[in-house]
A protein has these predicted regions:
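Domain-level marker for long, solvent-exposed, non-transmembrane regions
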Residues: 18-336
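Hydrophobic h-region of N-terminal signal peptides that target proteins for export
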Residues: 9-17
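Positively charged n-region of N-terminal signal peptides that target proteins for export
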Residues: 1-4
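A ubiquitous, low-specificity "background" feature that marks scattered single residues
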Residues: 8-9, 288
Length: 336
């Protein structure tokens, strides 16, 4: 009886251990490393396991996974409608596509799932040959797109639309470089044959040459010691544009600032309410191309401290909200 019980326990234990798929601990046994890249992810639920598996597989290529939020809306739309090629990805859950950029998902498939008493497991797999084909085709298609963008002959070379077109080309070239880096890990010989693609650095250099020839008239009324004008000027410089004091320039950015100081009834602090509205116009078409505004409030126990806080707040608003808004505006301009 004891012998029978012992045999039964051993049999049950062996069944329990057999339930854990081989791929959980050794995925290359199921998907040979000669043909596949694999990575296992685990988590408290299936979504966590899937995301971990995808991120672990992307890490094989020696770089951290980019958030999809860092991809411009222009590029996201171009990838969605097929204007920019990234191959055809699997249907990933929203929890993955919101956190991982499309180019990091190329070639990845979630193939296996397993759950034990403690965790959920997922296996991400990449077929090397199939992914190589996807990357080569995408890089070539995108490079042709870049060439078309930079070789187009616009009616007005020194315009914001032309600048935006080169910026779009730079984004596509940058995407190609990321895919080429991935291809180098999969097949370095194939990657060598694509080394003559447009570089994002060379396209950016051409873009900045154009920007230097696009002066923007800048004037801010009601400014506080010229601070907003200074911060906006620095912002335009980051995009490569130069600021001018000549009203006759084609592009002009004008704004109005308002500062209201007040002392609360307790007289313990000094407060300042501030607001700003600005707009960029193209005098050739007498239209407002871009408008931006912000407001805020600062307080301090003494006026000098209040001035410092306001200055810091204005710098933060321009480098944050205004910069992002202008960047989005440039991305919205027609590039075709």
């Amino acid at each position: 009886m004891k012998k029978f019980l012992l045999i039964s326990l051993i049999f049950i234990a062996s069944l329990a251990s057999a339930k854990t798929p081989q791929w959980v601990k050794n995925p290359s046994k199921v998907y040979p490393s000669k043909d596949f890249f694999t990575a296992v992810g685990s988590g408290k639920n299936q979504q966590q396991a899937e995301l971990a598996a995808v991120e672990n597989l992307a890490a094989i290529f020696g770089r951290s996974v980019r958030s999809s939020a860092k991809t411009s809306s222009r590029m996201q739309q171009a990838q969605k409608d097929g204007t920019v090629s990234v191959g055809k990805n699997s249907d990933f859950s929203q929890s993955i596509t919101q956190k991982v950029a499309v180019e990091d998902l190329i070639g990845i498939e979630l193939k296996e799932y397993y759950t034990d008493e403690k965790k959920h497991y997922a296996l991400a797999v990449m077929d090397k040959k199939e992914t190589e084909k996807i990357l080569v085709a995408s890089i070539r298609a995108n490079d042709a797109k870049v060439e078309k963008l930079v070789c187009a002959k616009p009616s007005d070379l020194y315009s914001l639309e032309t600048y935006a077109r080169y910026d779009y080309a730079r984004e596509i070239a940058s995407l190609d470089e990321k895919m080429l880096s991935k291809l180098e890990v999969i097949n370095s010989e194939t990657a060598k044959g694509l080394k003559n693609i447009y570089s994002s650095a060379s396209v950016r250099s051409q873009m900045l040459d154009i920007a230097k020839m696009i002066p923007i008239y800048l004037n801010i009324e009601g400014d506080l010691d010229g601070q907003i004008k200074q911060y906006v000027s620095e912002m335009f410089s980051q995009f490569g544009f130069r600021v001018s004091d000549m009203k006759e320039e084609r592009y002009g950015f004008t704004g109005t600032a308002d500062f209201v100081q007040r002392i609360p009834e307790d007289k313990k602090t000094v407060q300042c309410l501030y607001s700003f509205k600005g707009q960029l116009k193209d005098v050739n078409f007498l239209e407002t191309m871009w408008a931006v505004s912000f407001e805020g409030r600062e307080s301090s126990t003494e006026e000098k401290g209040l001035s410092r806080r306001i200055s810091k707040a204005l710098a933060s608003k321009v480098s944050g909200e205004v910069f992002s808004s202008f960047e989005g505006f440039l991305s919205s301009l027609r590039t075709e």
